[in-house]
Amino acid sequence: MKKSAPVPIGIVGASGYGGVQLVKLLQNHPKVEVVYLGGDSSAGKPFSSIYPHLEHSVDLKIESIELDKIANKSQIVFLSLPNGLAWKMAPNLLEKGCKVLDLSADYRFSNLETYQSWYGGERTDQKIAATAVYGLPELYRDRIANAQLIGCPGCYVTASLLALSPLFKQGLIVPETAIIDAKSGTSGGGRKANINMLLAEADNSVGPYGVASHRHTPEIEQICSNLAGYDVKVQFTPHLMPMVRGILATVYGTLRDPGLVREDLLTIYNAFYRNCPWVKVLPSGTYPQTKWASGTNLCYLGIEVDHRTDRVIIMSAIDNLIKGQAGQSIQCMNLMMGWEETLGLPQLSFYP
């Protein structure tokens, strides 16, 4: 049987941490070939001059961002760019027949007014934005499979929603009691220079940021509201940890039925995620660690009930650059192309 030609892939914004994760993962994908890497400040440079450890496997130069050229070369385009840039490119690429996966916040919101109030800027792509599908496969697998434009979730959002979704979908917690305490490694801040990410600043220190104002908050609330059927507000506080990668989100909510026990919640979560190969619900009394998910597309969920306070506690661990970014976008691509959801994605972490 003749082997089919690989699907050509373009990556715009290849020089950042999200971009290099995409390149690395797609190099090992059996059905695609990366044919275009795009960037502005790095245009003309060999990709290996930015990431020398990939010199033996990636023989491409960073090219200037020219949409016609990208569309002519690529069937699928990943946009790994800062917020506010993808929406200026996606309509043109879609018009030329490309499938587009956006890793920024530009296409995550069903209401562009919400996007503008948190991210700023004007938008003139309302019609295109209305066609975007939210790229969390565990919730929207069928819609993703039929989409041309995907708005991939944020990293904190992915960890938080995978913990919260069964609670809101099943109406298990009292409205307005959801609290998310999340911790992330420094790679979540990207590759640009940032004083807070310097070793001397971040090492041996843990601190909150974006308190009561983090831009992932409305994204979490949007999906939780859709699941619950009413407007949901959550309390979300992220923290920076002295580690490179990983997110641990610990979610709290007051149970509507204080008679529920841990085994009840385990049954509910296992049923909710029974067809989700990338979500692992841990056995009773086992709680996740970020190291378990590092380098994989997995999400580990631990479950506990505190009968003293009538609260459920869900702990969610992911790799912020894989399940929280590049890996999840490839998971969406697999669904869009009718391939196995697990194709080309890592399942085993480096341990210890």
Swiss-Prot record:
Gene Ontology biological process terms in this record: L-arginine biosynthetic process
Enzyme active site: 155
EC number: 1.2.1.38
PROSITE patterns recorded: ARGC
Reactions catalysed, as given in the entry: N-acetyl-L-glutamate 5-semialdehyde + phosphate + NADP(+) = N-acetyl-L-glutamyl 5-phosphate + NADPH + H(+)
Pathway(s) annotated for this protein in UniProt: Amino-acid biosynthesis; L-arginine biosynthesis; N(2)-acetyl-L-ornithine from L-glutamate: step 3/4
Compartment annotation: Cytoplasm
Primary location: cytoplasm
One GO MF term: N-acetyl-gamma-glutamyl-phosphate reductase activity
UniProt function note: Catalyzes the NADPH-dependent reduction of N-acetyl-5-glutamyl phosphate to yield N-acetyl-L-glutamate 5-semialdehyde.
Protein name from the UniProt record: N-acetyl-gamma-glutamyl-phosphate reductase
Species of origin: Trichodesmium erythraeum (strain IMS101)
Gene this protein is translated from: argC
